[in-house]
Regions:
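Classical Sec-dependent N-terminal signal peptides that target proteins to the secretory pathway
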Residues: 3-25
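C-terminal structured "cap/appendage" subdomains that terminate the fold
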Residues: 397-398
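Alpha-solenoid helical repeat scaffolds
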Residues: 14, 24-362, 370-371, 375, ...
């Protein structure tokens, strides 16, 4: 057993064993030792209990004070305040800094900010530290007394450069409509000290909110170049995506073990369908999610048809086979999970169905798939077009025309394929 762990274990065991005895059988010194040890080990509940026993047995108010400090450390501010006030009542001492700090916390939590501020000024006379300035500045900020809050928080920030006080200063700048100074401070801090994941995210949100994406790009580019780790790359990529600089985002993403779906999105955004198809295939192999098998097939189709050519039947067959496998596996998963089909399922059904129809592979079966798509998304003009095209292929032009009559003319004109199909169907005499 590690020596340090062993010591802690023995100390805990000793503490437990002694407290199992009646407190009265232990000497006052022993109880002080045990309570102090518990406090310094972070066991504030045991420390509070120990000091309260000492107070009850001896009536020495110093133990009530220690119990108050333990309760405050535990987060039990109600008990801490009760004991702090008891201490003041018995001793008539209103200048004890530890007790007054407890009361400040209590007043602040109860929303009695004026009382907390008044007491803090008293504490500052005894203990003028930057930590006290920070608390006082924060209390002024909650009251929106910005002229008093800023110098205190600024003084604290300039010495410790922590993110909490940074955020408070930026808040003040924004409340005073000094956006540029707030953003400059944010950028300057990240340039000098970097940022935690939380601050980086807040910074990105802030830059985006104020439509300062170029400033965000400069900030996160420098951060990434200075320290090219996953987190910094992630935020830089986020900015590049917002700016639609997908190629640069892709180059960086390829250097890190991000979720493959990020690269998939970047490839599709750039219409790099061959790479998107390969990426979807890798995701399918890793996650066994049939949706990615379907995407692999569709992106492969897009990559082959990118040269504005119509695919041959032989080229379409493996694409159709993968889509059929994807829909079959998807049904098996849904049967187990009891989940419902969604709009992406509808998309796959329509793509598969239309392919079977358009290439005269199995028109009726293709129409069945299209009907499944329409059952999930009845308002899709693309799916209605697929069904109409199926009727046309079967020679039922009357039904095909009927379906097209339900589609708004604007929608038909907006889609070249619908426009072409409509023209052919309207000219049909069958």
């Amino acid at each position: 057993m590690d020596i340090q762990i062993k010591k802690k274990f023995l100390a805990s065991l000793l503490f437990f064993s002694l407290f199992c005895l009646k407190a009265e059988t232990l000497s006052e010194d022993h109880q002080i030792l045990l309570s102090s040890d518990a406090f310094h080990r972070g066991d504030f509940a045991s420390a509070q209990k120990g000091y309260m026993n000492l107070y009850k047995q001896t009536n020495k108010v110093v133990y009530a004070k220690e119990a108050a400090i333990s309760a405050a450390s535990l987060g039990d501010i109600k008990t801490a305040m009760h004991l702090a006030m008891l201490y003041q009542k018995i001793t008539n001492n209103r200048n004890d800094v530890s007790i007054n700090k407890i009361l400040v916390d209590g007043y602040a939590q109860m929303g009695q900010i004026d009382k907390a501020i008044e007491l803090l000024h008293k504490i500052r006379k005894e203990e003028k530290t930057i930590a006290t300035d920070n608390v006082l500045g924060t209390l002024y900020l909650t009251q929106k007394r910005l002229d008093k809050a800023f110098p205190l928080l600024n003084k604290f920030y300039n010495q410790v450069h922590d993110e909490d006080s940074l955020e408070k200063l930026i808040t003040i700048y924004f409340l005073q409509n000094r956006k540029k100074e707030g953003l400059d401070l944010l950028q300057s801090h990240i340039d000098r000290y970097g940022c935690s994941e939380q601050l980086c995210q807040k910074a990105l949100n802030t830059f985006t909110q104020f439509n300062e994406l170029d400033l965000a790009k400069t900030t996160f580019a420098r951060l990434y170049e200075k320290n090219p780790i996953v987190q910094n790359a992630q935020f830089y990529i986020g900015v590049l995506i917002l700016l639609k600089e997908f190629d640069k985002a892709q180059q960086i993403a390829e250097l890190f073990p991000f979720d493959r779906r990020l690269l998939l999105d970047l490839y599709t955004a750039q219409k790099k369908f061959a790479q998107a198809s390969k990426q979807a295939s890798l995701i399918y192999q890793e996650k066994k999610d049939p949706k990615f098998l379907g995407l692999e097939a569709i992106y492969h189709y897009e990559s082959l048809s990118a040269k504005n050519k119509r695919l041959t039947k032989q080229e379409m067959l493996p694409i159709i086979q993968k889509l059929e496998q994807a829909t079959k596996e998807r049904q098996q998963i849904l049967a187990k999970t009891k989940d419902k089909e969604d709009v992406q399922d509808a998309f796959f059904y329509n793509f598969l169905g239309y392919s079977l129809i358009d290439y005269d592979l199995d028109i009726k079966r293709g129409m069945d798939f299209v009907r499944k798509a329409l059952a999930l998304d009845s308002g899709s003009v693309l799916y209605l077009d697929s069904l109409a095209w199926g009727y046309y292929k079967l020679g039922n032009c009357l039904e095909a025309k009927k379906i097209f009559s339900s589609i708004a003319k604007e929608s038909i004109q907006a889609e070249p394929e619908l426009k072409e199909h409509n023209k052919i169907i309207q000219e049909c005499k069958k």
